[in-house]
Amino acid sequence: MSNIDGKLPDILSDAVLKQSVPVPDNFVKVEGIDYSKPESRNMRSKDLIKSMATMGFQASSLGKACDIIDEMRSWRGEHRDKLEEHDRKGSFDNDGYQKTTIFMGYTSNLISSGLRETLRFLVQNKMVDAIVATAGGVEEDIIKCLADTYLGEFSLPGKGLRDQGMNRIGNLLVPNDNYCKFEEWIVPILDKMLEEQENYVESQGKDCLDSNFDQDSPVWTPSKLIRRLGKEINDESSVLYWAYKNDIPIFCPAVTDGSIGDMLFFHTFKASPKQLRLDIVSDIRKINSMSMEASRAGMIILGGGLIKHHIANACLMRNGADYAVYINTGQEFDGSDAGARPDEAVSWGKIKADAKSVKVYADATVVFPLVVAATFASE
């Protein structure tokens, strides 16, 4: 291609040197942390996350997650005294003003990990209003009160571990003896719960099983079972203990999908023909009612699957959550619930169209301690 006039051919100029439109005033400049500046050293967690928010990629999503959590926690509505009687439900702060009802969900592996202590901090300090966990998220909390979990390697061969009676959760190791200790601990409690159930039905009649929402009655639900376990463990390192102390319900719609399910199964043989009964219908009414009564609803979801959808579906009952923060590594391309972005939940009415929402694509054990340090624990 000849060039006798010293100019670029128009095709090159148009393709490579295309002019940009003026940059809008509200565009945010990409900047990172300059550690050569004194103010960038020994930063507080909140300042670190604020600085990361302009980095781009998941650092910016992390910053947005913290902003949303700060907003869901700081929102206040009307004072209780200004509300009609039927509106005096939901969550209120210590001064009597409406606040966001925060639903937190987490998967069992996060309790197996060292994130348990972070989650316990939130429950101990009444920073969430309801929890949805998988069965492992219940039993692993109790088991850690009875025996330790250890660091291992992702690459440890399963056959050798099985021969040694060691169970692997990622790069964590749980001796099988821990589950034996769990069985020894829980079976007498199940025996007592069955006895209380049978005595109650005998004294009240079978009608007592119908629509029984008495928190203290031995007409058991998964959340009542978990509350009882928190009471019985009586250990301040336990999430369940603090949930019991602070009257924070822990819902577990798949309570049989784990070691607890094994224990309940074994118990049917021991107690036969009597059986301990768990009413899941009362629990779905309870969590859905909490959502319907909330002045505003916020979701903090760590992981995916059942715990994510159970909270989102509860928020459908109020035409969607007002705030949503997802932290997981799931991708949406297989159509999984875990991988779905918040906008998919908007299409179902589970998150409001004008809600503040974000998904952080990251391992929750890396990200959530930073989130808590910059939000809940920064006061």
Curated annotation (Swiss-Prot):
List cellular component terms (GO). cytoplasm
Enzyme kind, highest EC tier = transferase
Q: Where does spermidine bind?
A: E139, E140, D262, H309, G335, S336, D337, E344, A345, V346, S347, W348, G349, K350
Return the protein name.
Deoxyhypusine synthase
- Function comment: Catalyzes the NAD-dependent oxidative cleavage of spermidine and the subsequent transfer of the butylamine moiety of spermidine to the epsilon-amino group of a specific lysine residue of the eIF-5A precursor protein to form the intermediate deoxyhypusine residue.
Cofactor(s) the record lists: NAD(+)
Q: Which SUPFAM superfamilies match?
A: DHS-like NAD/FAD-binding domain
Alphabetical keyword list: Hypusine biosynthesis, NAD, Transferase
Q: Which residues form the active site?
A: K350 (nucleophile)
Enzyme nomenclature, EC number:
2.5.1.46
The answer to whether the entry has keyword NAD is yes
